[in-house]
Amino acid sequence: MNSQTQMKQIVAEAAIEEVKSDMILGLGSGSTAVLMIKSLADAIRSGKLQNIKGVATSFQSEVLALELDIPLIDLASVSQIDLAIDGADEVDPGFQLIKGGGACHVREKLVASKANQLLIVVDETKLVRKLNQSFPLPVEVLPNAWKQVQEVISEMNGISTLRMATKKAGPVVTDQGNLILDVLFNDGIKNPKDIEKSINNIPGVLENGLFIDLTDKVLVGKIENNIPVAYSPAKVG
């Protein structure tokens, strides 16, 4: 197990300590969330946690939860979620996020907005001083609108590329049947709140991967003296 996987594993296990029996949980997507879901299944099997119900944020997390016998309920059937646990591609000091590297950010944001608490689990490589200086911002767009949206983003001084699939010909297609534009702004995103609103107001855009003022707590995995540890940084601002 390499050091990054060790960091992800320790923080995934630490996240389960935040879970109580009888909770409705938002089950995140991505590599760290996968480890968290597996740790959750272990806790349920051992009897440590009981009467847990999950709300999946993607087809990935839905399939994994079903394989591990974690009971699932549909997002539309719940009025609130006790706790959502998810990963992130970038986390800034104010706990603003970029998500969507796995093209799941639309459902992830729906679950996060319905959660009483959003817990983000990452390894320390995901902590940044400013968003979008290296990781592109995912923007989900209607298939027949991607070029038009790309032109508007260009007018906003953003460079966008249509995300292409790696194991099939053509672009990545989301769970909603849409496409993804990956956007980089010159010197990153200086005003995440404004950019989130501006992009979402472009006709043809379904949702972008900026998660603004949604995160309550961040757990970070790191290697300290050759030992993986998890810690919770303080929010700045």
UniProtKB/Swiss-Prot annotation:
The active site is at residue 108. GO terms for cellular component: cytosol. Substrate binds at residues 29-32, 86-89, 99-102, 126. It is an enzyme of class 5 (isomerase). Its EC number is 5.3.1.6. It comes from the Bacteria. Pathway: Carbohydrate degradation; pentose phosphate pathway; D-ribose 5-phosphate from D-ribulose 5-phosphate (non-oxidative stage): step 1/1. It catalyses: aldehydo-D-ribose 5-phosphate = D-ribulose 5-phosphate. Gene3D superfamilies: 3.30.70.260, 3.40.50.1360. Keywords: Isomerase. GO terms for biological process: D-ribose metabolic process; pentose-phosphate shunt, non-oxidative branch. GO terms for molecular function: ribose-5-phosphate isomerase activity. Transmembrane segments: none annotated. Catalyzes the reversible conversion of ribose-5-phosphate to ribulose 5-phosphate. Homodimer. Belongs to the ribose 5-phosphate isomerase family. HAMAP family: Rib_5P_isom_A. This is Ribose-5-phosphate isomerase A. It comes from Prochlorococcus marinus (strain MIT 9312).
